[in-house]
């Protein structure tokens, strides 16, 4: 006896012009995925994506040379080579021939409807993954590769609970969660100052819903104004006026509510080995199968340009 493939969507389950898929993904509620939407989009060419970082030497006050002296040759410092593994993420759709053919309420094509729905879900999964505390997994024949996420990179300017611990700053070790404590303005100001001292110019504070409300209660430094030309994206924008410039306060539904990030988005990129795409899967019966897929990784161009207040209460 033949049987349906697992998770096939048929008429019993049902209740009720084509664009380039990559454009469809990026046009779906960009404010729902603030990190993915704000990070630079770049290209990866291998499953292990590599890049280089560098830093200026510390400024000194004794750079004085004797008149007519022979030049003293400065030592050159090599760049730092960093890497992150590309992660494959997918969503699949299986629709019976009958379900595609019957007259349906609210949609002409069940396949098109389900693909559009899965595209939104895939983008949300990607935002959740990028902003998580996952450590890189290089993978193998029986193990999926995983990208080192935001929480495994930011170490230079982190504020953790006393029993928390920083990661390795290279994407391959997550930071250790500590005992949760209330989010305070002094923690935020300390991290912003640390980022600025390290050379960063942060523009965004990314928080979950609970700590967005906590931040709104901070002293007179939090203001609100209309976005003007950006009103298509935001009817209003929260701004935190720090001693080192204004930062946009952005709530994120999919990042960890226990983490508050201070981000210089010039130093974060998402490197795509394979951009968002859709494939027809082999037809093995009376059903149509589709796979939506993306393969990408997080590029931390200099983690010292961002900061983290971790181990925050969420209720």
Task: Name each region found by the language model.
Residues 2-315:
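Flexible, glycine/threonine- and acidic-rich loop/arm segments that mediate assembly and lattice contacts
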